Regions:
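Beta-sheet entry/capping signal
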Residues: 87, 121-122, 135-137, 197-203
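Generic secondary-structure transition motif, activating predominantly at the C-termini of alpha-helices
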Residues: 54-58, 98, 143, 250-254, ...
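Conserved catalytic cores of phosphodiester-cleaving nucleases, focusing on short active-site segments
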Residues: 118-169, 186
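Short, flexible loop/turn elements at secondary-structure junctions
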Residues: 92-96, 124-128, 142-145, 206-209, ...
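Metal-dependent nuclease catalytic regions and adjoining charged, substrate-binding loops involved
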Residues: 151-181, 185-278
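Metal-dependent nuclease catalytic cores that hydrolyze phosphodiester bonds in DNA/RNA
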Residues: 1-133
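Residue-level signal for functionally critical sites in structured catalytic/ligand-binding pockets
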Residues: 13, 91, 118-121, 140-144, ...
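Context-gated lysine
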Residues: 17, 40, 57, 66, ...
Length: 279
């Protein structure tokens, strides 16, 4: 079972009920709220505006056709990752078919990540590895301000005419932690495939569509003075827990006599917590 970039952030009860629906009465599931529908609509509008603006820049951009089937998207993504001259890939889709095609194109053993499927908004070429193959960094488009005050973290603010993180202006601040967790998912998948940077660069384009807020996951600190670790390590822990919840829920779906995979816990987060839950 491959999980997407939201899994590490989702409530365990939501995961439990999603993967063991036969163990619950879900007939009175709450409808999605008007607020959530409007937030999604505004997010789609912002993403379209950001991409429209990006296409006006003098950059080599490859767009994966969103009307293709999943297999075609994955094959096109693999070709783009390995053989294209593109500086930016829009709409990449990375799962098993893409992984197998990458192995074919590079002549090396398939580097599979059986736990993840990745669909980043953008992938930006940030260099080449010792093998001569491109290295990519994931970038998401967000309609909110992705930058938070934090004295223990660093960002590198770049513009489209000098888009690499190494060309960005260093700033003492931190990416939104939910955004960082989603980007960590994509980074970890790329790392497994040998296509990520050693520095762990990820980025967000927020309300200011002319700026890329780059960060190193290891410099995205949690807790006072970074004593609670960094966003990359935190994501790996939460994703591992999510995998266990899903596995237990799938087992319970087959055998309802098994104990619950998780217990309810109030979580106020509007995007991923109880405020957004339809169960």
């Amino acid at each position: 079972m491959r999980l997407d970039a939201r899994a590490a952030l989702q409530c365990h009860e939501f995961l439990h009920k999603s993967f063991a629906p036969g163990c619950f009465d879900l007939s009175e599931r709450a409808p999605e709220s008007e607020m959530m529908r409007e937030l999604k609509r505004q997010g789609d509008i912002h993403e379209a505006r950001t991409i429209e603006n990006l296409m006006t820049k003098n950059l080599d951009i490859l767009v994966i056709n969103k009307d293709q089937g999943e297999i075609e998207k994955e094959l096109t993504t693999a070709e783009a990752l390995i053989n294209s001259t593109a500086q930016i890939i829009i709409g990449a889709w990375i799962s098993s078919v893409c992984e197998e095609k990458i192995a074919e194109l590079t002549g090396r053993e398939t580097a599979s990540d059986p736990d993840r499927v990745s669909r980043p908004d953008l992938l930006i070429r940030v260099g080449e590895g010792a093998d001569g193959k491109p290295r990519w960094a994931p970038v998401d488009i967000k309609s909110h301000d992705p930058i938070n005050e934090n004295k223990s973290s660093k960002l590198y603010l770049a513009t489209w005419d000098s888009l690499l993180p190494t060309e960005g202006v260093e700033t003492i601040a931190r990416l939104d932690l939910d955004d960082a967790a989603q980007l960590a998912h994509y980074y970890e998948h790329l790392r497994t495939l040998g296509l990520a940077t050693d520095e762990g660069f990820v980025g967000v384009i927020g309300r200011d569509i002319e700026t890329i807020a780059w960060a190193k996951l290891s410099e995205t600190a949690l807790g006072l003075g970074g004593k609670a670790g960094d966003a990359g390590v935190d994501y790996l822990f939460k994703f591992d827990v999510a995998k266990k919840i899903v596995a237990a829920a799938q087992a319970r779906q087959k055998d309802p006599s098994l104990p619950p995979a998780a217990y309810s816990a109030l979580e106020s987060d509007a995007k991923f917590g109880c405020g957004a839950c339809t169960f």
